[in-house]
A protein has these predicted regions:
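Transmembrane beta-barrel domains of outer membrane proteins
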Residues: 34, 43-45, 84-86, 139-141, ...
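Short loop/turn motifs that connect adjacent beta-strands in outer-membrane beta-barrel proteins
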Residues: 21-27, 51, 88-104, 144-148
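Membrane-embedded beta-strand positions of outer-membrane beta-barrel proteins
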Residues: 31-35, 56-58, 105-111, 136, ...
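Residues that define the transmembrane beta-barrel architecture of outer-membrane proteins
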Residues: 25-31, 36-38, 73-79, 128-134, ...
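Outer-membrane beta-barrel "beta-signal"
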Residues: 77-94, 171-183
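Transmembrane beta-strands of outer-membrane beta-barrel pores
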Residues: 37-39, 58-64, 85-87, 111-117, ...
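Bacterial Sec-dependent N-terminal signal peptides
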Residues: 1-27, 179, 183
């Protein structure tokens, strides 16, 4: 009698676990490196909610400036904070697609600070202007294998020059294509 009740209880317990579905969620924390045509970055994505992650990033952004006589290229430091809303995780799960390493489509607000602390350039004594950019954007991120990622995104916003000598309205375009590795 006890074994029959125990068997029935275990059967109900295992059945209820098999029907319980976990809600799709971004990863608790992801650390990685990325590179693209326009620089190299180290990043972390931390879960805020099941579909929102806060991406923090430091790196070197590539810049180019040219005129008739010379072309100047430079790598300048960047510090980025970017809340991301991964809006299609449930749809990806329903289609048996990966959401590992936060693979999915996202909407974000990119806030980037480019200080004039230092630069790496092909020319001496260039003028690096400190800026802060605010750019809403759309993007995709995908995982290949277990650790390799690629992502693309586009956004249009504005930036503020932190020196006193410029008061114009500035438009900023964020267009990125990156490959990376997550640890």
């Amino acid at each position: 009698m006890i074994s029959k009740k125990l068997t029935t209880a275990l059967l109900i317990l295992f059945t209820s676990f098999s029907f319980a579905q976990e809600e799709p969620s971004v990863e608790k924390s992801i650390f990685g490196i990325q590179t693209g045509i326009l620089g190299v970055w180290v990043h972390n994505e931390a879960r805020l909610t099941n579909s929102i992650a806060l991406r923090t990033e430091i790196g070197l952004d590539f810049g180019i400036n040219g005129n008739d006589n010379t072309t100047t290229t430079a790598l300048i430091p960047s510090i980025r904070v970017e809340p991301r809303w991964y809006y299609n995780l449930e749809k990806r799960i329903a289609k048996n697609r990966k959401i590992a390493n936060n693979s999915g489509n996202f909407l974000a607000l990119n806030v980037t600070y480019n200080p004039d602390w230092f630069y790496i350039s092909n020319r001496e004594n260039i003028n690096v202007i400190s800026t802060v950019a605010f750019i809403p954007k759309w993007g995709i991120k995908r995982t290949v294998g277990n650790h390799f990622t690629y992502e693309a995104g586009i956004g249009l916003g504005g930036f503020i020059v932190l020196e006193d000598y410029e008061t114009d309205t500035n438009v900023a375009l964020d267009l990125h294509l990156r490959i990376g590795y997550t640890f």
